[in-house]
Every structure is written in C-alpha cells, then in structure tokens.
Amino acid sequence: CDLACSLIYAPVCGSDGKTYPSECSMEATACIDEVVITKVHDGPCETKCSAACTKEYNPQCGTDGVTYANPCTLEYAKCKSDGEITFDHAGPCKPKCPTVCTLEYNPQCGTDGRTYGNPCQLKVAECESDGRITLDHPGECDACSLKKVVGPCRGAFRRYYFDSVSGKCEEFVYGGCGGNDNNFKTLDACQKRCMEE
C-alpha cells in the first residue's frame, strides 16, 4: 500500500459507516486493513445515534471526565464520539484536582492537623479528600497540642510525639501515611519543638 494522501480535508462516508478525511485516506485504510471499503457519498457519514434516553438518574463517569445521567446517555456520547468516549466507572466523576502549586511559604493549618505550605497545597488536599480536609486557621498548626495519629497505612516507623498529658515526648509506631504534624523523626526534634520554652 503506497498511497500518499494529501492533507486537504474533503470528508467522505465509507461503506463501513466511518467518515474519512479524504477518499485517498479511505482507500489507504482499506488497503492496510485488507478489506473492501467503497465511498457511499461525499461528506461525513450521518451517525445513527439514538438520543431517546429515559430521565433515570444512575450516574456514569465517562473517560472524558464528564458525568452522564445514566448508561443510555453515556452510550449516546460514545456513539457521537465514534467510540472515543467510553465507560470509566459507575457514579459521578471526581473533579480534577490541581497538581501544580507555587513554592511560596504561606502556612495554612488544615482540619487534619497538618500544616500545608500555602493555600494551593491545602486546596489540593481538600480536593483529594473530597472536602474532608479544610482550613482550620491560617498559619502553622500547633503540632504539640495534637493527639498522636498512627495513620491508615501499615508500615512500622519509629517516631516521636508530644504527649500533652505527661508533658513529654513519647515514642510511637507510625504507619507511614496520614497522621498529623505531631510526628517527629527524632526525640531531639520533638523536644526542641514542644518542650523548650
């Protein structure tokens, strides 16, 4: 198949129901795929996508990040996009969370007891936690008044926290993720932050 097709867009409808950018492009596809495709007419093919869907609400997330009201409306979008849009998962799509933040230091204390470097970093945490983490107050969190939090992961890392009842830094086993700012890698770091007046 040695067909050099021009880049001029002159769509044609092929007998396979697909629209090709040009008759040459259709012939090249037929040659490469070793099938017979003939031109039905000039211009794009008419899609036979049925938009007759019920108003049932059963949200479906498409691969385009759009939440469709039900499987039928997603199927319609799939048909209109020539299969570009497909089913991703049941339920609404999650909003895309920002991922790029500046390095400015403008500390923000989150409701999870963690200090975030700036408002953008807190917004990312808020988005990724589906709104469970929000702003507690501007500025750094008071790590020393927070309760010890092991976190949901199953690692085993030796860490230290300040126990406000005993007034001392105590050892604990940290799971490796989650947790809060009352989590120090060394006893010395804990004592310097929480015990020195």
From Swiss-Prot:
SUPFAM superfamilies assigned to the protein according to its UniProt record, in alphabetical order: BPTI-like, Kazal-type serine protease inhibitors
Coiled coil (residue ranges): none
Gene Ontology biological-process annotations: cell differentiation
The BPTI/Kunitz inhibitor domain, residue ranges: 144-194
Gene Ontology MF annotations: serine-type endopeptidase inhibitor activity
GO cellular component, one term: extracellular region
Top-level taxon of origin: Eukaryota
Residues of the site described as Reactive bond 2: 55-56
Name the UniProt record assigns to this protein: Four-domain proteases inhibitor
Organism of this sequence: Melithaea caledonica
